[in-house]
């Protein structure tokens, strides 16, 4: 069990079923010290309004010893790497994940998908690329991993991709993990929970990492401090309330 989970959705994304309070309760039971709520960006049909993300600034930082990061799973919109997060949203958020979602950016050919993903990585606006192993979006894995390492952007291994969605992701995710290993980049593990009961579950992710001998020191979820150091290296101001996590 790793004490950090970086990808989960609440009832604000209406195809998910848990509240912030539900996640806090599960985190306490499971020994999760720090987690990020990352509801879908507003260009998705059932996503929250952009005011939802701006108003996350009112959330407490720590509840019952559990740290809460304010995040978003934004949508990659085009080959220029634009995402549906901007302006005051950035000011309120700690963690920006971005990925391909069919209602916003339909699958294209390998070159176009790769260009869109690398442009997003190079934009400086994103910390993590979500589920890059999605088989519906063929990419140049080596080029993406090298760009991610260069720009200090983590590539996600998404536990839900092996259980509930994006069927057939295993081979691609092994390739992603191996390419990140070779490029000296970062991997982020995400449960992609749409119900609090699955938060912190990374069993399938770890099978992927074990298969390619991925180094423990390049996994962001190993400790709250490792993740916070990564975010601070990308410009996030230190959060005093997290000092004792």
UniProtKB/Swiss-Prot annotation:
Q: Name one GO molecular function term.
A: zinc ion binding
Report whether Metal-binding shows up as a keyword of the record. Answer: yes
Q: How is the cofactor bound?
A: Binds 3 Zn(2+) ions per subunit.
Q: Which Pfam families match?
A: PHP (PF02811)
Q: SMART domains per the record?
A: POLIIIAc
Judging by the UniProt lineage, the source's domain of life is Bacteria
Q: Which CDD domains match?
A: PHP_HisPPase_Ycdx_like (cd07437)
**InterPro entries (UniProt xref):** Phosphatase_YcdX_put, PHP_dom, PHP_phosphatase, Pol/His_phosphatase_N, Pol/histidinol_Pase-like
Q: Partners and quaternary state?
A: Homotrimer.
Show the PANTHER family listed in the entry: PHOSPHATASE YCDX-RELATED
Indicate what this protein is called per its UniProt record: Probable phosphatase YcdX
Name of the gene encoding the protein in the UniProt record: ycdX
């Amino acid at each position: 069990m790793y004490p950090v989970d970086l990808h989960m959705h609440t009832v604000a994304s209406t195809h998910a079923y848990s509240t912030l309070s539900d996640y806090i309760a599960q985190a306490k039971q499971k020994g999760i010290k720090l987690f990020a709520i990352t509801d879908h960006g507003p260009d998705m049909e059932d996503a929250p309004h952009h005011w939802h993300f701006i108003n996350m600034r009112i959330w407490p930082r720590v509840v019952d010893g559990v740290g809460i990061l304010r995040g978003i799973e934004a949508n990659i919109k085009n080959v220029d790497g634009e995402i549906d997060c901007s302006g005051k949203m950035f000011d309120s958020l700690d963690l920006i994940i971005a990925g391909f979602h069919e209602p916003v950016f339909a699958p294209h050919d390998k070159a176009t998908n790769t260009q869109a993903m690398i442009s997003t990585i190079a934009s400086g606006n994103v910390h993590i690329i979500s589920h890059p192993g999605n088989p519906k979006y063929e990419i140049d894995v080596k080029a993406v991993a090298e760009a991610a390492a260069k720009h200090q952007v983590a590539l996600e291994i998404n536990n839900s991709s092996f259980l509930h969605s994006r069927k057939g992701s295993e081979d691609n995710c092994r390739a992603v993990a191996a390419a990140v290993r070779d490029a000296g980049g970062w991997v982020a593990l995400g449960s992609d929970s749409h119900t609090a009961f699955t938060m912190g579950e990374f069993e399938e992710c770890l099978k992927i990492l074990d298969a390619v001998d991925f180094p423990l020191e390049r996994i962001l979820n190993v400790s709250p401090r490792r993740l916070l150091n990564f975010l601070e290296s990308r410009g996030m101001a230190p959060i005093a309330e997290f000092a004792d996590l």
